[in-house]
Regions:
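Enzyme catalytic cores with a strong preference for nitrogen-chemistry domains
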Residues: 1-355, 371-380, 412
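ATP/NTP-dependent adenylation/nucleotidyl-transfer catalytic domains that generate, transfer
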Residues: 7-8, 24, 160, 219, ...
Length: 637
């Protein structure tokens, strides 16, 4: 059974009765068992939840401390058939000192006790009145519930590669938290059992801390805080439960629930490992990790595929929220335009050349050039747009190209490549009735020759139009549309190109908006093969390759996180459930892998262009791969 690197976690908050340890265990049991039956492998409950956090001076009473230990023993016994790592909070007396602790157990066995390092003693908090810090423990083991177990900071290491660290409440709020050290020492999941009271705006700040901690440490973060039933003498606790991963919230509950709460999320530790490898994380770990930290071996229950409750965005390059998407489009558009403006300014040119096809990519390139020329205060007629109709050009795309150029106010030139291509095929002895790769590439290279030579003649920069998806699949002709003097779309995937063009259509409106909408409605095609008998596009890229949205999904998870082919299959089937069949997705994944490997030689020599997002295939930056690597291992699904 494969878990694909996912670990299912639960943040649970039971209702408590202050000082009544047995009642509190009674309330915990159904929540813990429910979480376990849902497939949770790690279950976190709040700080001091066995007694209640708000016992105050009752913590000095032997009866409370003894009842807490007895209640923990009963809880462990009644959860003997649960293999999940369960983490609960209680006071523990060690050699006369009282510690605020997290006890971890599974399969009826206590496996470790972690004391709180940083005790808040300001404003409403007076923990030092009752507890001592875990930064200076008198021993490294403790006997609790009749079991001698490790005591102090430690990592709980599972056979599936997961490593879990624990911190308590205030530990997260200090400049260098125990969780940070635990992450640098190998923890990919940090559990924080907490008792954080509520005040106006505090929840937003707390969520921000959780997000930032999971982002800084490239970790999963499971947070469970005290809730209903805690004393309201001076404070109110909401039972906030949150699970985060790498800066994003995976799950959180509605606070102030009256009868306990539980949230679940699967944390992708393989993804986190990839992010750590591709950053300075391990360099920092070499300097700041605790090399002497204890590692406690645990075994987590197997995660059933049906219990992986994670959803995957079918369009990871495109924010689903419209407001965020528009802001993202504006930022990308500005990056592209600034990159092009700098290159034109540096060379000292005043003109640009663009091949306009009436398709999406060339439309976006022209819009970027339009913006760049605004930045440089250059006249728009210095943008030379060239349409080059060939054997497959349709009236629709030709009309769109002309109208778009006119709306921008750029200079328009029309050069029919049919005579030159016909002569060239005669010269090389190619039968024009054979509509093969030679037939197509003759046209592509003729167009690039025209564009390059025009740029030389005019003292202009040839702006490339190819996008990231085409680079990934090698869907371009080597030394033809593959080549330019600066590629503004080189790190923009096809799915995002559509939204960028749509964004400009909305922003600018009018006749420009209308023609951009027409282009958006046009099938993606290189138009290198003749149109059908009705004069419509016959050669449709997605009929050959499969949907770009699926290939962009593969690209995002493969390049950024190193997702394996079987994991890509699993994720894509979830993301496109009800849209494409498993058989279709498998066919397209094999095609993606074959082309990604076989077409690397094109990516090894691509022009400069601006990086706009987290995924890029520039051989000078994000992706350096041999052109003759074998794809066999990646075709084994």
């Amino acid at each position: 059974m494969k878990d694909f690197g996912f670990v299912k976690t639960a943040a649970v908050c039971p209702r408590v009765t202050v000082g009544a340890a047995d009642k509190n265990v009674d309330n915990m049991l159904p929540l813990i068992k429910g979480a376990a039956s849902s497939g949770a492998q790690i279950i976190a409950l709040p700080e001091l939840c066995i007694t209640g956090y708000t016992c105050s001076d009752l913590f000095s009473q032997d009866r409370l401390i003894e009842s807490a230990e007895a209640a923990l023993g009963r809880l462990i016994l009644e959860c003997a058939d649960i293999g999940a790592l369960v983490i609960v909070g209680l006071p523990v007396r060690v050699r006369g000192r009282l510690f605020n602790c997290a006890a971890a157990f599974q399969n009826g066995r206590l496996v470790g006790v972690v004391p709180k390092s940083y005790l808040p003693n300001y404003n409403e908090f007076y923990e030092k009145r009752h507890f001592v810090s875990g930064l200076d423990t008198p021993c490294d083991t403790v006997t609790l519930c009749g079991q001698e177990v490790p005591f102090g900071n430690m990592l709980f290491c599972a056979g599936n590669g997961a490593a879990v660290g624990i911190e308590l409440c205030e530990d997260m709020w200090v400049p260098v938290s125990p969780g940070t050290v635990l992450a640098l020492s190998g923890a990919d999941i940090i559990v924080n059992i907490s008792a954080s009271d509520e005040m106006v705006t505090k929840n937003d700040f707390r969520l921000s801390l959780i997000e930032q901690t999971s982002a800084r440490c490239y970790c999963g973060y499971v947070y469970s805080s005290a809730g209903i039933g805690e004393s309201t003498t001076d404070l109110v606790f909401s039972g906030a439960c949150t699970i985060a991963e790498n800066g994003g919230i995976l799950a959180r509950n509605e606070r102030f629930e009256r009868n306990g709460a539980a949230v679940y999320a699967c944390i992708d530790i393989k993804k986190l490992e990839a992010l750590r490898r591709n950053s300075e994380f391990y360099d920092n770990a070499a300097r700041y990790a605790d090399r002497d930290i204890r590692r406690v071996d645990i075994t987590l229950p197997e995660l059933r595929e049906s219990d992986i409750d994670r959803n995957f965005d079918a369009h990871p390059f495109v924010p689903s929220d419209e407001k965020v998407r528009r802001a993202r489009c504006a930022e990308i558009f500005n990056i592209q335009a600034a990159g092009l403006a700098k290159r034109i300014e540096h060379i000292g040119l005043k003109k640009a050349v663009i091949g306009i096809s009436g398709g999406l990519d060339s439309a976006l390139a022209l819009l970027v050039a339009d913006k760049a020329f605004d930045l440089l205060a250059l006249p728009k007629e210095n943008i030379i747009c060239i349409t080059m109709p060939g054997f497959g050009t349709t009236k629709r795309t030709k009309s769109s190209a002309v109208t778009l150029t006119e709306c921008i106010g750029a200079q328009l030139r029309d050069i029919d490549i049919v005579p030159a291509c016909t002569q060239h095929m005669r010269d090389i002895g190619h039968d024009m009735s054979i509509l093969d790769v030679t037939y197509e590439n003759v046209q592509a290279r003729e167009r690039t020759q025209i564009l390059m030579d025009t740029a030389n003649k005019e003292g202009a920069l040839l702006v490339g139009t190819g996008d990231l998806s085409e680079l990934a699949l090698g869907w371009c002709t080597y030394n033809a549309d593959h080549m330019s003097m600066y590629g503004v779309n080189c790190s923009v995937p096809k799915t995002l190109v559509r939204y960028l063009v749509d964004f400009v259509a909305d922003e600018r409106g009018g006749k420009l908006g209308e023609v951009l909408r027409e282009i958006l409605a046009t099938p993606v095609s290189p138009e290198l093969l003749p149109p059908d008998k009705n004069g419509k596009i016959a050669q449709k890229t997605e009929d050959t390759l499969g949907p770009y949205e699926v290939h962009d999904f593969f690209l995002y998870h493969f390049q950024r996180f190193g997702a394996s082919p079987d994991k890509l299959m699993f994720m894509a089937c979830r993301a496109f459930d009800g849209v494409y069949s498993r058989e279709q997705i498998e066919k397209w994944l094999r095609l993606f892998m074959k082309r990604f490997f076989s077409q690397q030689f094109k990516r090894s020599c691509i022009p400069d262009g601006p990086k706009v997002g987290s995924v890029s295939l520039s051989p000078r930056g994000d992706w350096r791969m041999p052109s003759d690597a074998d794809a066999s291992a990646w075709l084994d699904l």
